[in-house]
């Protein structure tokens, strides 16, 4: 097994249980065309290849790419791209290999330090969702981030990230993956989480306004919502709206669920 490199935040997943849970979460079919981000040593890649039509793997580390080519290069449904997933245009890079496109599912064990930009790359933002979207995304990420993504209103983990991700996708927490499942063990635990991108045709009428509201609403968690939003919405008008949807005028941002945020945005963006 190659030695993990700190500069790439590499931690090799070695738990058979975790690998199997990732594969089960992906609900694979023989017609699936996968994108795997950061295949590393190929431990998951080898299990995925027999189950799908094709797999494009993107790996930044040149040395790992050489090892992957040596071990998996003869697989006719495997395409390896060397580069930074945040900078690569997969469709352009793989256009001469039509059987690998379009990608319909993503599986990734991603470095913790690029979780946010990876989510932007795969799902987009409220104001600019990724189109066309994937059918399913399976990520192994930091447990704390996964808990924030699936958090419910009023809980300590509920925040802007929760609302944004739940707006863009149906998010499902699959399982915990303890730090001992990796070599070397990271400092924190991980979790497997899935995203099924939503159809957004009947959501916010002004997504950019909704995104602005959410960011402002959570800019000071201890303040009441009407104080955080006063630069956009008159306090009295907001109080009137909150009363109409059976919320106290002293509510904070974390008390509103996704549908209430959408209703708030649609009402005041007219």
Curated annotation (Swiss-Prot):
Signal peptide: none annotated. GO terms for cellular component: cytosol. It is an enzyme of class 2 (transferase). It holds the Pfam family RrnaAD. PROSITE patterns: RRNA_A_DIMETH, SAM_RNA_A_N6_MT. It comes from the Bacteria. GO terms for molecular function: 16S rRNA (adenine(1518)-N(6)/adenine(1519)-N(6))-dimethyltransferase activity; RNA binding. Keywords: Cytoplasm, Methyltransferase, RNA-binding, rRNA processing, S-adenosyl-L-methionine, Transferase. Coiled coil: none annotated. It is found in: Cytoplasm. The keyword Coiled coil does not apply. S-adenosyl-L-methionine binds at residues 11, 13, 38, 59, 84, 109. Gene3D superfamilies: Ribosomal RNA adenine dimethylase-like, domain 2, Vaccinia Virus protein VP39. Belongs to the class I-like SAM-binding methyltransferase superfamily. rRNA adenine N(6)-methyltransferase family. RsmA subfamily. Specifically dimethylates two adjacent adenosines (A1518 and A1519) in the loop of a conserved hairpin near the 3'-end of 16S rRNA in the 30S particle. May play a critical role in biogenesis of 30S subunits. HAMAP family: 16SrRNA_methyltr_A. This is Ribosomal RNA small subunit methyltransferase A. It comes from Crocosphaera subtropica (strain ATCC 51142 / BH68). The lineage of its organism: Bacteria, Bacillati, Cyanobacteriota, Cyanophyceae, Oscillatoriophycideae. The gene is rsmA.
């Amino acid at each position: 097994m190659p030695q993990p490199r700190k500069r790439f935040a590499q931690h090799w997943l070695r738990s058979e249980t975790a690998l199997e849970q990732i594969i089960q979460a992906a609900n694979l079919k023989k017609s699936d065309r996968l994108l795997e981000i950061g295949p590393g040593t190929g431990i998951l890649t080898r299990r995925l290849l027999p189950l799908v039509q094709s797999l494009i793997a993107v790996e930044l580390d040149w040395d790992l790419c050489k090892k992957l080519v040596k071990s998996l290069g003869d697989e006719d449904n495997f395409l390896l791209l060397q580069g930074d997933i945040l900078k690569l245009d997969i469709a352009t890079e793989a256009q001469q290999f039509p059987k690998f496109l379009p990608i319909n599912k993503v599986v990734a064990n991603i470095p913790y330090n690029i979780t946010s930009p990876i989510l932007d790359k795969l799902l987009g933002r409220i104001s600019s969702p990724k189109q066309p979207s994937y059918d399913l995304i399976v990520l192994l990420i930091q447990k704390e981030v996964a808990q924030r993504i699936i958090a419910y209103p009023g809980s300590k983990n509920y925040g802007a990230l929760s609302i944004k991700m739940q707006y863009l996708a149906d998010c499902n927490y699959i399982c915990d993956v303890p730090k001992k499942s990796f070599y070397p063990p990271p400092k924190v635990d991980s979790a497997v989480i899935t995203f099924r991108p939503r159809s957004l045709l009947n959501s916010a009428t002004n997504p950019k306004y909704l995104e602005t509201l959410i960011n402002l609403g959570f800019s000071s968690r201890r303040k009441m919502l009407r104080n955080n939003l006063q630069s956009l919405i008159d306090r009295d008008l907001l109080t009137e709206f909150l009363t109409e949807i059976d919320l106290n005028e002293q509510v904070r941002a974390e008390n509103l669920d996704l549908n209430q945020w959408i209703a708030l945005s649609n009402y005041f963006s007219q």
